Amino acid sequence: MTLISPPAAVQLRPQALSEKIALSQARQPAAAPAGPKTLIVYDNPPNSEFSKLGMVFGIMLKNLMGHFDSNADLLPVQDYVAGTMQAYDATFYLGSYYGNPLPPAFLSDVSTSRKTVVWFKHNLSQLAWNPVYEFPARSGFKFSGMRGMNAAPTAANPEPGFFDTIGYKGKSFVKHYVFNTATGIINADPDIGVITVLDKARATVIVPVSNPRTGETVPYITRSGNFWYVADMPFSFTGPRDRYLVLCDLLHDMLGVHHAESHQAMVRLEDVGAKVSVQAMKTLTDYLHGKKIPFSIAVIPRYEDPLGVFNNGMAQTIPLSEATHLKTALNYALPRGGEIVMHGYTHQYSNLRNPHTGVSGHDYEFWNIVANSPVAEDSTAWALGRLNAGLAELASNGYTPVAWETPHYHASALASKAVAQVFDTTYQRVVYFTADKPDFKPAPNKDFAMGQIFPYVINKDYYGQRILPESLGNIQYDIGIIDSTSNAMNTWQDIVTNAAYAKTVRDGFASFFFHPFLLEPAARAPGYQDFQSMIDGITALGYTWVAPSQIP
């Protein structure tokens, strides 16, 4: 999977092979962000299995602040000191843990501050129900309490319903919900805080949320002067049609940063390695070039099949210098609007099945997905070695990437930090961790990891990366007959629908990737026809097609 690339001015700094390509050298320090100064306060209850859940949500919000050139500070709520928020333009409180006791100093400052305060989900009762703070009179609305499922789901009634449908800009954003009747486990976040507006001169409902089963509608996002209330935690169970996009858009208003309406689209040809079909690449290149659509190519510099899965049991390595098909495809595509994104070094790990075949393009490179842990060698230095090796392989064959994309969008924290030292721009989704060496075993204070999609450019994320968004996903077919790992379905219509939702973000991108092997006869799929339909559908929505290097 791949993302977008940087403008020429922020591409990799040129280094000579004779200097051994000192690509691990850190970039020059950037100027301090010019955006609003923001504070993110999160729940961090002691000795709970969910102690660090608030932190991972805080990291996700901090990443979004990177779109606004704001290098947000993170603070556990128990460490809050009176007067702290007055040094910030905006304070966000993430109420992820029900009943977490909040410091009186924090509650008092929220009550009296004239700076922007945005409160998410839980624990508003500690402010709204304490007469000392005169909350209803000050805010113009009252807090009634929390609501969850309409009833407990059962095998006979697996979908009893909840407040799951957020209405915004003519779209219905439906929250994720899956109930496993065998285990009784609910995969959802149904709880919301219910408020009632008492004084419309003081409080305004910005976004409603409805409960289709009961017919009720209540406020989802409410504003009272400098105070905003978001009824749930929009960082849980996110997706390309989720209420997370509503928050991403409204952050402009919450922060007072008014980006112009702008909608750009990007397409990336994915997992292009030594055994790519030259004909498939030429077909896609000619189509995009004919449409005057720039594109990027996620290139795997070195091919490895250590177990001989596709070579009659004999291990096979193909360096780029010997990858005739790949170089032919690249040399045809680059003069016709293509740009290279470096997609890992080998896009696989060691001689292990991680988890599929051990073959380049199939497996994870910077994460042990089988053990769900960092790889044994994990360190910034180890990751830098692989990044440098991949760049050297490209450079020695005359190629320069405009961005980086992590294989399967999943790398360790230390590997992501290494990427930020080498590449000025990445084009991807990212997994974030609450520790560099996370421990996920069920226990008090266990670590959390969370993947994040971005609808727009993030100038600096938690690991220091600049990120161009891949926000729509990709066409998928059930091709298990030729690849046992590929049996999901995601149609071109799904991608175009995702693009329609992405337009609700005022500067949201429509960015997706496509596997050229879907044009090969063995795939037994209408890949090329569907690719054209997808391009036409996104174009019809009014997006402007751009190359990664054109994004400022």
Predicted regions, residues:
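Metal-dependent polysaccharide deacetylase catalytic core of the NodB/CE4 family, i.e.
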Residues: 39, 124-131, 294-412, 509-518, ...
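C-terminal domain-boundary segment and adjacent tail
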Residues: 71-74, 251-261, 279, 283-305, ...
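A glycine-rich, often tryptophan-bearing local segment used as a flexible ligand/cofactor-contacting loop or short
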Residues: 97-179
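Aromatic-Pro/Gly-enriched surface loop or interdomain linker
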Residues: 13-88, 261, 288-290, 297
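Catalytic beta-strand/loop cores that center a nucleophilic Ser/Cys/Thr
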Residues: 155-225
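Catalytic grooves of carbohydrate-active enzymes
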Residues: 264-274, 278, 381-384, 388-403, ...
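Helical hinge/lid and interdomain linker segments adjacent to catalytic or ligand-binding clefts
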Residues: 48-127, 279-282, 307
